[in-house]
């Protein structure tokens, strides 16, 4: 007898990047920063009050949210902090996609999107890129939710934020713009996310690529 949910029994899990242990190998497969942290990071850690670790941290990350809000000219109430982008993607899928619903994304892209759809007992709907690897405009009713990776990974092609803004206005679901590589691009969609008229668009950032 299996106690596992029926829709999970066939699931093939997300395969993480290989972690080689051979001497002299240059590791590039998981897009990690090849440089060490700033010396200021070491100074901040050395000055950290270790006694505070015996208590739970602020569950709503107030200070971090206030700082991020000040950087982007928005309210702290518009900022959500997660334990990595994967957690935020998981919460996004569970919050905005019903069981049996659909989540759209371009293909090729980050393979976790489809895995999270299956975990939710939803259907992932890949939308193929154009022959030049640019992102085509998805239909406005393509899915219940859509993840637009910009710049795209793995192609690195960037879509003009104005095009994404136009899609968000016509799209009938919730749009998440995954900007994991935004720090390497000349423009981003943050102004779209913090705009007062925005009702269906979220922008996700990470510290794992450029920091």
Enumerate the predicted regions with their spans:
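Short, structured coil segments at secondary-structure junctions
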Residues: 75, 120-121, 171, 197
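Active-site pre-lysine segment of PLP-dependent enzymes
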Residues: 132-142, 154-210
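N-terminal "arm"/small-domain region of PLP-dependent enzymes with the aminotransferase-like
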Residues: 1-55, 142
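PLP-dependent aminotransferase-like
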Residues: 95-149, 154
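Short, well-ordered alpha-helices that flank and scaffold nucleotide-derived cofactor binding pockets
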Residues: 43-47, 70, 94, 98, ...
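Phosphate-binding glycine-rich loop
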Residues: 62-102, 120
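Short glycine-rich anion-binding loops that position phosphate/pyrophosphate groups of nucleotides
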Residues: 31-34, 85-86, 110, 150-154, ...
């Amino acid at each position: 007898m299996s106690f596992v949910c029926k829709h999970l029994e066939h699931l093939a899990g997300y395969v993480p990047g290989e972690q080689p242990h051979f001497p002299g190998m240059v590791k590039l497969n998981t897009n990690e920063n090849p440089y060490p942290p700033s010396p200021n990071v070491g100074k901040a850690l050395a000055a950290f009050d270790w006694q505070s670790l015996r208590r739970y941290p602020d569950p709503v990350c107030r200070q971090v949210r206030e700082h991020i809000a000040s950087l982007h000219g928005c309210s702290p109430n518009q900022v959500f902090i997660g334990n990595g982008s994967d957690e935020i993607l998981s919460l996004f899928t569970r919050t905005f996609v019903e069981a049996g619903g659909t989540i759209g994304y371009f293909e090729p892209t980050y393979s976790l999107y489809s895995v999270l759809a299956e975990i939710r007992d939803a259907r992932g709907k890949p939308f193929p890129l154009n022959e030049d690897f640019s992102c085509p405009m998805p239909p406005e009713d393509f899915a219940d939710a859509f993840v637009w990776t910009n710049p795209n990974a793995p192609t690195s092609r960037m879509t003009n934020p104005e095009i994404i803004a136009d899609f968000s206005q016509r799209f009938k679901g919730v749009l998440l713009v995954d900007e994991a590589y935004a720090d390497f691009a000349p423009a981003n969609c943050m102004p779209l996310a913090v705009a007062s008229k925005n009702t269906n668009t979220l922008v996700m950032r990470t510290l794992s690529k450029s920091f």
